Amino acid sequence: MRILLVEDDVMLGDGMVDALRHSGYTVDWLQQGLPALSVLKSEEFAALILDLNLPDIDGISLLRKLRREGHQLPVLILTARDALDDRVVGLDAGSDDYMVKPFALQELNARLRALVRRSKGQAQATLEYGDILLYPESQQVTYQGEPVRLTPHEYKLLLELISQSGRVLSKEQLQQSLYGWDEGAESNAVEVHIHHLRKKLYSELIRNIRGVGYIIPQLDQATRIPAR
């Protein structure tokens, strides 16, 4: 599960990243707020942990902007402000939970789990292929219980192939699915993404039918998924 952390305190950030990764999360850490706006336009996260006291933009302003732009991911606010009014402002701006520094990392973990679990009031739907799990809502992938970090195009390609497992898809079909009619796409883009998927998951996952296209076999036709 992928988390975005926006925190400018290096010592605190280091500790949070270590604790969250130890708990199985994939963590992207930014020390300023404005880059988060760009990242969230192109990347998918299960939750955002946001410090209010950032060097380039106030966290409340950042949160309001995210909500105005339609971002619905769960947000956990971190701040040194302990006044009731500050907590109310944060919640009214669109945060889902609030923690006051200093805090125990165990509590952060517990709150984050609860936040993701109750996000949108339901468990996230999954697509399963053997030991591979895809979470379409957050575009996250796990393999044998471990998170696998994919680019948006890699995720989309994997989803397309698994959704149609047992069917050969031509390079042109896959390129159309990924890029539409964008003539600026590299001619070997599909091959590059497939190469990366094989490295990040396992080499036998995607088969090349020479002169025809690519296929992920149906599970009853597939070889046993190898252990890492």
Describe the function of each predicted region:
Residues 24, 109-112, 136, 178, ...:
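Short amphipathic alpha-helical/adjacent loop interface patches that line ligand
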